[in-house]
Amino acid sequence: MGIDRILFMPDTFQIGRTVMSDLARDGLLEAELCVLDMPITASYEDTIRAAELMEAMGAGCCVVLGGDGTSRAAAKGLDETPILPVSTGTNNVYPTLTEGTVAGMAAAAAAILGPSENCRIRDKRIEISINGRFADIALVDAVITADLWVGAKAIWDTGKLRRVIATRCHPSSIGFSSVAGCVGVVRDTDDFGVDAVLGDTGERVLAPVAAGVLSTVSISHIERMPLD
């Protein structure tokens, strides 16, 4: 389809080098294949750094394999390069289950056609600040909880949830964004997000807040959030 170079992120399982070896043996591709020359730490920081390098090297599209967290890490390292997020597991909201050949064709089209064609969107994200200083981003949702302990950052007690802010939401999306999604659907192409305030009173919804977990939550107030 006209792609002349394909970059791989290095990883501890040597996935990129295995793919390169198999393709070279079979003679299936004419494109140049290479693994990024960068140290790895076996953490999400590798994904951020790889995304930064790919954008600096002029990548036209980044195919991200993984879940919501992997896509979020890649997004932290990119400014203008589009992401094609491919889900490699279940209960993901941001990446989608896509057949590999179709994903490759879409990535090639996005890289070749560029921003002038209607083949990409400027996605939404939530920017989180602490005491007025930028701290992090979220691609799908950010939650305010009354829980005092950070731990592994997994929240299981929905009774301590106070707010759910989401860029997109649907009742079938596993996670806290489904709480707002039970009231109304917000798509990735909509020019707004949603802010749901939770409490002891208000509309009660039964939401799939985690894989295999349904919780009843009361929404005292919900409103659209315009893009900034």
PLM region spans:
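Residues that line or immediately flank small-molecule/substrate-binding pockets and catalytic motifs
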Residues: 10, 66, 146
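ATP/NTP phosphate-donor binding region
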Residues: 1-61
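Glycine-rich nucleotide phosphate-binding loop and flanking beta-alpha elements
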Residues: 14, 69-70, 150
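Active-site histidine-anchored catalytic micro-motif
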Residues: 34, 38-125, 129, 133-138
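Structural signal for hydrophobic packing residues in well-ordered secondary-structure cores
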Residues: 2, 110-113, 146
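ATP/pyrophosphate-binding catalytic subdomain of soluble kinases
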Residues: 118-228
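Short, solvent-exposed amphipathic alpha-helical segments in soluble enzyme
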Residues: 23-25, 78-80, 143-144, 159
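Short, glycine/acidic-enriched capping/hinge loops at junctions between secondary-structure elements
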Residues: 17-21, 96, 154-155
